[in-house]
């Protein structure tokens, strides 16, 4: 307001408003502090967006807690969302589906062993699924194997077709990364790749029980569907991939970011690697999103 009346002295301006000069200066100092804090937050979020292009606002709020503590910033979740919106940093997720499952084959199909069962620790249940990844001239096919308890990606492979040999490569990687001695179930859809002789034999050679969906419903394998969606929609879709070699190199980096940095609601906003290695206890979550109490002396 003072800028609109430059001819009025500061002393007179303060008298008209009934405030002291100290109060006037304090007001502008506070505005400057708020502006500086907001710019710090925006810059930090932009940096995180380079690594996690479409990570949701709630998970960003969780990842930003150490930053808020370091800079003694006090901001609530809703205020952060408003700041993200004002700076064009909220994201809208795209949805598209291409079917990758062919269950019309003569290979043996196995029953669903996990209808009413949920793992109580890492490497008791692995879930597998395939999704597509677009490149400049064709679709590639991404096979992932994920630990259902920790949500850690154990094995992955990208290929130019849906031949069973490629899903077997993902399984071999998962077996190399196995670190806990426990009985293990492998759960997948009834696609030809997972029923193939080589794939089934590799599971049996490693004493892994075989479980499969029964009616093609994604709800029979929700964790695998979810993790595939995260890797594809939150990461790979935001790069202009040229070929399989480039996609595989990028995927290695993306999986590391996912395993070591990205928090999950379903594991109490911890990272998959932390839960997997330390066998942390997690609460299975259903329904509405929940955010645990985050200790930050600078927030309400």
Q: Where do the PLM segments sit?
A:
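Double-stranded DNA-binding cores of transcription factors and transposases
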Residues: 1-12, 17
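Basic, flexible linker segments flanking DNA-binding modules
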Residues: 14, 21-122, 271-280
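C-terminal domain-tail junction helix/linker
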Residues: 204-208, 230-300
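RNase H-like two-metal-ion nuclease catalytic core shared by retroviral integrases
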Residues: 101-103, 188-190, 196-200, 210-232, ...
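Mobile-element integrase/transposase regions
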Residues: 74-144, 166-170, 177-184, 289, ...
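Residue-level signal for the short linker/turn that defines the boundary of a DNA-recognition helix
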Residues: 8-9, 55, 75, 242
């Amino acid at each position: 307001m003072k800028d609109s009346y430059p001819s009025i002295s500061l002393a007179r301006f303060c008298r008209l408003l009934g405030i002291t000069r100290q109060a006037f200066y304090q007001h502008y100092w506070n505005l400057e502090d708020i502006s500086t804090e907001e710019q710090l937050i925006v810059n930090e979020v932009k940096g995180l967006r380079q690594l996690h292009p479409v990570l949701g606002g709630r998970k960003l709020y969780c990842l930003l807690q150490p930053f808020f503590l370091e800079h003694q910033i006090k901001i609530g979740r809703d205020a952060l969302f408003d700041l993200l919106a004002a700076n064009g940093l909220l994201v809208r997720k795209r949805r598209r589906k291409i079917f990758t499952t062919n269950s019309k084959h003569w290979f043996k199909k196995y029953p669903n062993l996990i209808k009413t069962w949920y793992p109580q620790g890492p490497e008791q249940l692995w879930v597998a699924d395939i999704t597509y990844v677009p490149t400049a001239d064709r679709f590639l096919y991404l096979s992932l194997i994920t630990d259902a308890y920790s949500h850690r990606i154990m094995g992955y492979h990208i290929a130019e077709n849906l031949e069973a040999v490629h899903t077997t490569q993902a399984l071999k990687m998962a077996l190399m990364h196995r670190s806990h001695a426990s009985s293990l179930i492998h759960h997948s859809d009834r696609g030809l790749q997972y029923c193939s002789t080589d794939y089934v034999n590799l599971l049996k050679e490693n004493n892994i029980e075989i479980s499969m969906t029964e009616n093609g419903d994604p709800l029979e394998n929700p964790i695998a569907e979810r993790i595939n969606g995260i890797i594809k929609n939150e990461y790979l879709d935001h790069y202009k991939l040229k070929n399989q070699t480039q996609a595989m190199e990028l995927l290695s980096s993306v999986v590391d970011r996912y395993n070591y940095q990205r928090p999950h609601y379903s594991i109490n906003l911890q990272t998959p690697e932390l839960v997997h290695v330390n066998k942390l206890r997690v609460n299975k979550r259903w329904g509405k999103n929940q955010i645990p109490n985050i200790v930050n002396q600078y927030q309400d």
